[in-house]
Amino acid sequence: MMLYLVQHAESKRKDEDSARPLSKKGWEDIRKVAKYAEKHLHIQVSQIYHSGKLRAQQTAQVLANHLHPARGVIVAEGLDPLANPKMWKNRLTETAEDIMIMIVGHLPHLSQLAGELLTGQANRELAAFTNGCIVCLEKGERERWKIRWMITPELVPNCDATALRLGAPIEDAQKILEEAAAIAEQRIKDTI
């Protein structure tokens, strides 16, 4: 089973709009990630689940427009920011092995769900979620989960994220990290 955990894209602050729709940057970031996921990562999903919050719904819809989930997009319970991750852990345990699911949600829930699946401990932060990122988990032998790869909006225009997949040559991963560090350093210089 493949599970794609997506933190909703950047949203407006509550004082700007109480519904907290995606910000202009949020729309740009998630479109970029979705397009990249379709064209370069070749993600295929059976269904996309999202919380009932507008920012998660908008993020899920952009992803669906690019990934074309066979069973569509559905709002689901238990995906709010403070939801108990064990509900989804149990649900995923009962899901068929050959299915590919995407969950669009919020922190701290997504981080806790990843910790629960990977270690059995919700308080273990194992992936550095950011707005608009996708973390791919795979359930393998003996029901054990592992992180396959992760992509953030900041990495998309600057590197080939497929090199971050497990088993990629270490030189490729090193090159990507060096490029990302150089870009981050330049951004810091630009703000000074």
Regions found by a protein language model. Give the residues of each.
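Residue-level signal for well-ordered alpha-helical positions
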Residues: 62, 116-117, 140
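Short, flexible helix/strand-to-coil boundary loops that buttress conserved ligand/catalytic motifs
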Residues: 114-117, 151
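Domain-level recognition of soluble alpha/beta enzyme cores
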Residues: 121-148, 152-156
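C-terminal/domain-terminus segments
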Residues: 156-166
